[in-house]
């Protein structure tokens, strides 16, 4: 059961697609007080949700702030990341369980046992929002109700489930060719190569650097013949430059965000001084979306949207203030106080809260200050592209994912999990974030494999891949100035080729589970508590996940170990993928067991009575035979497997037309 409550005059977000009558609020399990909505937490209750965030799957014990933030510091004391996903679930999951969605584009704080260990408090900055309260018997039921409320998740083309290689940056066409050639030379499967900001002419959206990519169109076609898709980045700011067509059009038509005086608001990002397209304005959004056609016409069929929280390096106003203040500091004998005052001032230029309250949007017939609608910018940028694809290539699936997001954007594109680091803790965070994002509708997602920032080690990249072969978005990405982590650069290339090859063996299952989750509004990545709610031990496990209902994964997230302790919630059989072969290994009884997991092997744990389909693999998704499958199972009574298969390219995707039963 879902109830809708309206407080004040909410700003519409288009997050919800299902029409509901509103009710008058009365206190129940959630109580409305002066400082927000409160829920008394019982000792055995779990709090799930909040999508892209730090810490565990169970969100108890911290204060989270929904405020899309350009924040690469994904640490335990971080309150906000790139997404604003205002959905939580609370309860024991086997009796009455509650879901709550706060629909507002401004800042929302979720204090989940932080101030008071037994209290959950949700507070908003303004008394203008909608609350959707869901009551159901289980976690899975709550998720399904919520997902039906917010609409079907984005469906990517099947080639986008292959392995992708990225780097900030591949600076030339020849470097792209070199990457492709090295993967081919070492027999490592690959389906995509990503182009970061240096493919552009001086970081200008929808341009090509013809000095470095003189034959861009030929490069796209050449890669396509190798079954490799090029996926360029698009940023949220448009360079302020006379003679640059996109800027000239935007300025002439009034499509940029304005300051309080009605002038274009000028900020700095990669190209220097820029303007933000008013993504919330219908005409500006259509105009910006139309620009993607420039690259589509060059053969591009995938994009990633970045810097769309939106990130602000500086504003003209704050930069001027800093320069003036620096003149004063030059004359000082800086002591501990004035020195850190100076460094704090300089550091505060970037993503300054005052800047976010200094420009305006035209949205649904009204003028809003940006901070009131901040969490919609990345969502509507991605929506602009998706709606343009519907206009220009309506029957074709285009890969599209974003850094910033709000619930509702899940209908238009996926997300990657932002600028993580090459830390083992960020591998663990990737594991824990997957189900939280699924709860909020984001199915096409994954982290930068190996970590974006910092220097990766060979064992970290390999262990990360052992988990990431299960995530829909499988992309190795790293930052300029860090160690190169294309897998052919490491000592044991054969292990990387083998692990990436596993992705193509298990792809029929991964794709099938993804499509069923999207079309049925269910989870692809399940915490153990979703399947074993009455098992007190399963409810506490956070580093093992079910992919669908048939198989469990338990990734190794520690350095210098050859295995790990696994909790088996029931009797399960171990399948080991190594050297292209699947070994049906040991059967584990319910309980804790230590499992050997040597580096370079992938381990799947199959439930008794269930099937797991495996293909022969391939060097790209196009090579995989989705019909020639070997079915693995154990036990006497085996349930048929609901296998989803479509053409992977068009928008002909319905359960009724594309599911069939596989049996031993």
Located regions from the model:
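Catalytic and substrate-binding clefts that recognize carbohydrates or anionic sugar/phosphate headgroups
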Residues: 1-157, 167-168, 173, 180-185, ...
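Catalytic core of carbohydrate-active enzymes
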Residues: 60, 73-75, 376-377, 382-398, ...
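Short, hydrophobic/amphipathic alpha-helical packing segments
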Residues: 64-68, 81-84, 177, 285, ...
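Extracellular structured ligand-interaction cores
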Residues: 82-86, 95-97, 105, 128, ...
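Short acidic-glycine loop/turn motifs at beta-strand connectors
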Residues: 89-95, 260-261, 569-570
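N-terminal small/glycine-rich loop or linker at the start of catalytic domains
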Residues: 149-166, 261-276
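Aromatic- and carboxylate-enriched substrate-binding clefts and catalytic-loop regions
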Residues: 189-496, 531-532
């Amino acid at each position: 059961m879902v109830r809708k409550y309206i407080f004040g005059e909410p700003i519409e977000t288009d997050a919800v697609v299902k029409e509901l009558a509103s009710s008058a609020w009365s206190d129940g399990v959630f109580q409305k007080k002066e400082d927000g909505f409160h829920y008394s937490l019982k000792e055995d209750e779990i709090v799930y949700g909040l999508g892209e965030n730090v810490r565990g799957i169970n969100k108890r014990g911290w204060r989270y702030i929904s405020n899309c933030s350009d924040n690469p510091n994904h640490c335990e004391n971080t309150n906000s990341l790139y997404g604003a996903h205002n959905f939580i679930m609370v309860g024991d999951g086997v009796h009455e369980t509650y879901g709550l969605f706060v629909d507002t584009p401004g800042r929302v704080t979720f204090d989940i046992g932080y101030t008071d260990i037994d209290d959950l408090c949700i507070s908003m900055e303004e008394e203008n929002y909608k609350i959707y309260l869901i009551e159901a018997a289980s976690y899975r039921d709550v998720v399904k109700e919520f997902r039906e409320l917010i609409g079907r998740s984005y469906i990517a083309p099947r080639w986008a489930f292959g392995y992708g290689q990225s780097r900030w940056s591949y600076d030339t066409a020849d470097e792209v060719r070199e990457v492709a050639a090295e993967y081919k030379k070492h027999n490592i499967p690959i389906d995509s190569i990503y182009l970061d900001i240096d493919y552009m002419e001086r970081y200008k959206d929808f341009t090509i650097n013809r000095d470095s990519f003189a034959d861009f169109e030929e490069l796209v076609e050449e890669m396509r013949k190798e079954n490799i898709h090029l996926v360029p980045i698009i940023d949220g700011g448009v360079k302020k430059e006379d003679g640059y067509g996109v800027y000239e059009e935007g300025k002439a038509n009034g499509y940029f965000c304005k300051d309080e005086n009605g002038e274009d608001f000028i900020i700095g990002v990669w190209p220097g001084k820029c303007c933000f397209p008013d993504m919330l304005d219908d005409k500006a959004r259509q105009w910006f979306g139309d620009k993607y056609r420039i690259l589509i016409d060059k053969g591009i069929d995938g994009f990633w949207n970045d810097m769309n929280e939106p990130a602000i390096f500086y504003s003209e106003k704050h930069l001027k203030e800093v320069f003036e203040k620096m003149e004063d500091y030059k004359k000082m004998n800086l002591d501990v106080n004035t020195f850190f005052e100076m460094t704090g001032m300089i550091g505060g230029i970037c993503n300054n809260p005052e800047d976010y309250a200094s420009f305006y949007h035209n949205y649904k017939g009204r003028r809003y200050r940006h901070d009131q609608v901040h969490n919609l910018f990345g969502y509507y940028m991605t929506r602009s592209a998706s709606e343009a694809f519907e206009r220009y290539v309506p029957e074709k699936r285009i890969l599209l994912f974003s850094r910033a997001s709000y619930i509702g954007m899940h209908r238009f594109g996926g997300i990657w999990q932002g600028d993580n680091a090459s830390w083992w803790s960020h591998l663990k965070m990737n594991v824990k974030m997957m189900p939280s994002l699924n709860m909020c509708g984001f199915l096409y997602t994954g982290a930068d494999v190996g970590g974006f920032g910092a220097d990766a080690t060979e064992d970290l990249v390999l262990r990360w891949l052992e988990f990431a072969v299960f995530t829909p978005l499988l992309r190795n990405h790293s930052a300029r100035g860090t160690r190169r982590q294309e897998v052919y650069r490491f000592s044991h290339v054969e292990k990387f080729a083998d692990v990436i090859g596993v992705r193509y063996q298990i792809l029929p299952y991964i794709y099938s589970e993804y499509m069923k989750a999207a079309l049925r509004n269910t989870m692809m990545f399940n915490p153990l508590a979703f399947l074993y709610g009455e098992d007190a031990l399963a409810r506490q496990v956070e580093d093992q996940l079910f992919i669908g209902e048939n198989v469990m994964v338990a990734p190794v997230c520690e350095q210098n170990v050859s295995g790990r302790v696994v909790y088996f919630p029931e009797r399960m059989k171990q399948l080991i993928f190594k050297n292209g072969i699947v070994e049906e290994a040991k059967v584990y009884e319910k309980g804790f067991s230590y499992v050997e997991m040597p580096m370079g092997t992938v381990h799947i744990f199959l439930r008794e009575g269930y099937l797991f389909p495996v293909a022969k693999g391939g060097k790209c998704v196009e090579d995989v035979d989705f019909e020639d499958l070997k079915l693995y199972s154990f036990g006497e009574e085996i349930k048929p497997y609901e296998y989803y298969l479509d053409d992977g390219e068009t928008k002909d995707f319905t359960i009724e037309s594309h599911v069939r039963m596989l049996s031993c």
